[in-house]
Amino acid sequence: MPPKCILFYKTAAADERLEAVLERESTAGRLELLGVSAEEQSMVPPARRALPFFAPAAIPGMAFDYAVVIEASAEEKRDRARSRVKRLLPPFLLRLHYKIAAWRFTRKKRRLWQSFDGWGKPIERQPDMALPERSPLGAWSIPAAKTIPARTFLLPGFRMDEYAALRTRGITFLSDNCWGGLMYHTLGMEMTSPFINMFVWTDDFIRLINDLPYYLSQPLVPEKLRERRGAAYPVVLLGDVRLHFNHVTTPDELTAFAEKWYRRRERMDMDTLLIESSFDTPENQAKYESGFAACPYPKLIFTPYPSEKYVYLSAFDENAARYKGDFSDCTRDCAKNDYPGKIPLDFLQTFLTRTAQLPEEEK
């Protein structure tokens, strides 16, 4: 039976690409559209108004598999916010406004670290800490496990049956930067990896992935505060591996972030583990390749130059003005499905079907 889906519109802006994919999957019998929902019925595009309309409050009591959430992208939301400010300030004052706001924010956060006395001490578990579940439809008591973001349908080669199988099986991304978290966001899947919203230098990352059970058994120990690009964040030890929690700005955030780390660690499934990294130059490939080769887990490695063994992202050189020499931005664009070219990898199939494709003696 195909998954039963409800389209939930949080924006009135129609996306022709999305509508085409939904129509294709519905016609192919890979999903069943039960109806539509929105805060206001006028937000439903004309092409979908022939479907039954459900009030949001009625959805939790219905029998359905997924609510497809159609909303404005984060970029569109930021652009709208910026446009409001731009209407009030001329360009030179706008730039000054952002600089002053960033300086004040950083100064305020840095003061909070002056009284932090947890350096060198393991961060204890906080099992009773309330960490609210983030669901795009949480206001209507629809859990994240029953939602799919519209962006997922725009992935290259998307098929609802393969995606539903991937949701059922799960996947554990272990990345040395934000790539894994961005992939979970794009796929609309539960984060079953603790390595989210952080980065790890390559030398540390290789030690980590080659002795993963040991490092996962270690507590998090705050080591020091690091200044980077005008901001300050904590560096946290996991054994002798340094984790850079560059999205953490206060001691309270560190406590909550560490608890998320521990809880996500418990959700890891080593049978669905995928290691992600990149070689930005042939010299780095020569330096680190043997370390990655020794790692016993499936690996996905990107390069900005042609390679028979790794995933070549040709758009890095073709869009030099966009990336300005930062190859990690290019790999993250792949995870966000914002890569300015044809993605040379089908994220939804390669690792979902990996075991089935292996010869019997390699399983």
Language model features with spans:
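Membrane-proximal basic amphipathic "stem/tether" segments
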Residues: F8-Y9, R78-G120, P127-D128, S135-A164
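Short, charged/polar "capping" segments at the starts of alpha-helices
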Residues: A13-L18, E39-P45, E75-R80, A102, ...
